[in-house]
Amino acid sequence: MVAEKRLMRPAEVPAPIDYVELQRLTRYFDVNGRWIRWPTKFSHQDPCLWVLWSRLPPRQIFSEREINELLRANHLFDDPALLRREMTDRGMVRRTLDGRVYKRVERRPTLTALTLIRLLSGNL
């Protein structure tokens, strides 16, 4: 019965991609895909964080030092603590209470974030 109800609902259509906004988001990254500066707009922070999330190997456990190294390799404003905290607060990364162990949370990024990830990786 639950499956039947689900089938009867109209399919959810994702919001169209705002290509002007996507172009603005690419300005936060250099030609090598490294994040240059922290966005002041909250709506720009999330897609940029998804880019870093996509570069964390899935199903692996990282020490604080290891995740810092991965983050530093992918951003140029040298604030891995900010990035760790934001990714944890937004449910992209989980960490132990003592902050020693981190793991990427497997979730589907937003359509804008997915498009940005593909664009920066050269897959668009």
What are these regions (language model features)?
Residues 74-86:
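Short amphipathic alpha-helical interaction segments
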Residues 22-58:
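Short alpha-helical segments that sit at the start of domains
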Residues 89-99:
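A short, conserved structural fragment
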Residues 36, 68-77:
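Short helix-coil junctions and helix-kink-helix linkers
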Residues 8-15, 110-124:
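Short, amphipathic alpha-helical interaction segments positioned at domain boundaries
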Residues 1-2, 84-90:
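Basic amphipathic alpha-helical segments that dock to polyanions
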